[in-house]
Amino acid sequence: MQKNFEEYPKYLFHEGTNIEADKLFCPKKAVIDGKKGWIFRVWAPNARDVSLVGDFNGWEVGATPMKKDDGGIWEVFVEGLKVYDAYKYAVTSKKGKTVLKADPYGLHFETTPQTASKLYDLSGYKWKDAAWLKSREEKNIYESPMNIYEVHLGSWKRHDDGNVYSYVDLADELVEYVKKMNYTHVEFMPVTEYPFDGSWGYQVTGLFAPTSRYGTPHDFMYLVDKFHKAGIGVILDWVIAHFPKDEHGLSLFDGTPCYEYSDPRKGEHYEWGTKVYDYGKPEVRSFLISAANFWATNYHIDGIRVDAVASMLYLDYCRKDGEWLPNKFGGNYNLEAKEFLQKMNVALLSAHKGFFTVAEESTAYPMITMPPDIGGLGFNFKWNMGWMNDTLSYIETDPFFRKEVHNKLTFALTYAYSENYILPLSHDEVVHGKHSLIDKIPVSYEDKFEGLKTYLGFMMTHPGKKLLFMGGEFGQFIEWRFDQGLDWLLLAYPRHKGMLEYTKDLNAFYKSTPALWSQDNRWEGFRWVSVDDNTQNVISYLRYDKSGDYVLVVLNFSPVPRKRYLMGVPELTSYKCVFSSTMKKYGGNSSYKAEYKAEKKSMHGLPFAIAVNIPGNSITIYKPENN
């Protein structure tokens, strides 16, 4: 059965270097000896028997037996099948137990609570994003704006009857909204197939399939295509740190630990109730890297954000003494996971120019975004969880007491250039009793809005790329709920409408101001002006682009206005306000753009100064007249 053609891909699969294992294992149409049918393959090296069951044979175990090769790959050719036929593999262990397993390489699935795989033909979609892909190849992502809107597709909006939006619905509405709001990228919380709604997609059973909750694979292609035509990049939340124990999934696939580590001290996340991939097993490496490569190739995805990287890197992650195995050197690093991540990043970034990878890594593990050839993991970006935790703690503090925690606002600059960072205000920060972004701010109703505007302004002008979870842009008050849409009705209220308008304009200002993104990864792009005025809750800094043009950013995290506040500046010229959170259109109390003439008075280590009036709870951005 096409043996000569398949032998080399099988060799690479068993070697751990086949990054297109989908071409070997995903069911596909074929013509053999003049007969039309579908080829199925599945890796189950320790199974006693495997047969294909489905609609076509009444789900009768053994009716369509598969043949095993020397490497543990079972295969069969079946005539008379059609797209959308449901199927599973009936895998019989050496102990004689038969379990019906979904296809690890399945392209489409039944909608939960059903769990069967479904035949699908990915061919036929006519992409219209060639211009986007070409521009992506030519872009330097480190010196370009990156402002990400994080979305859970099932709860961004819902129909009046409570039903979810389809991929096609989202292509009609979400794309237009993200473009109107001036974001550069959208990040989908996991869309790879998963059985349990309450996992938010983080317990994956189908790494090669967009969830059928919202439509077909072609529908998902259409959604990505629409984003690209609108000039928006698409990032997937990518879950390869663990997988669920659902019987139809990967757990004990052939009756033995096949995809997971055999020792539960490495192979189980007790706290999450899930299994851990065996990153040292060649076939598992081929499977995982092929999955990411598959989405980049077939769905034109622009990047992946790898979830829970810390849990992959540390053998003692969320484990007590005696519950974990040290590595060969006696340490707590998972050396196999490190090597796997390095190989994954090299493979993906080599195969897809302009594609990028992001690590959600919550510790101080070194060199996450450094090249593998010097010992790094090879990611393009890392989430800056330290910045997020510190600054959220700061805004949760009453303004009167913020002087005691002023360092939480400024500390991130001591390490801001040690990695290529993304500043994340993600879904994790607006659930489980943590409150929504706006409700974290412990002041009056009116001041909550001004405080959130100030905080978002701080994020957008701080070194690092940006990410904001849906709802934060208009000040959603209640926590995120995965089974309901956002509270769009709030936009009927002026303060929420003003908040949305503010975020839209702030995003536009960021995107049009190279000083705020062209030197995110080097010290030359930043200079503190006022860093330690904790008594007045004021900070200020300069952001520079590569040509030397700059903006002066002034932030007041107190509700008390500051009059004639002396601010050091580099030039003896006029400084004009080019952006302010207190404009009336945003619900503030002023709409003018003030201008200040510099004086020959040194301040903050700079040769000149301006005496500015700083509104309470505000961000104000100035440009020198000669810019």
Give the residues covered by each predicted segment.
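C-terminal beta-strand-rich structural cap/linker in extracellular carbohydrate-active enzymes
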Residues: 83-87, 592-627
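Short proline/glycine-enriched turn/loop motifs at strand-loop junctions of beta-rich domains
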Residues: 43-50, 570-573
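Conserved, mostly hydrophobic/aromatic
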Residues: 42, 89, 151, 178, ...
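Catalytic cores of secreted or luminal carbohydrate-active enzymes
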Residues: 495-516
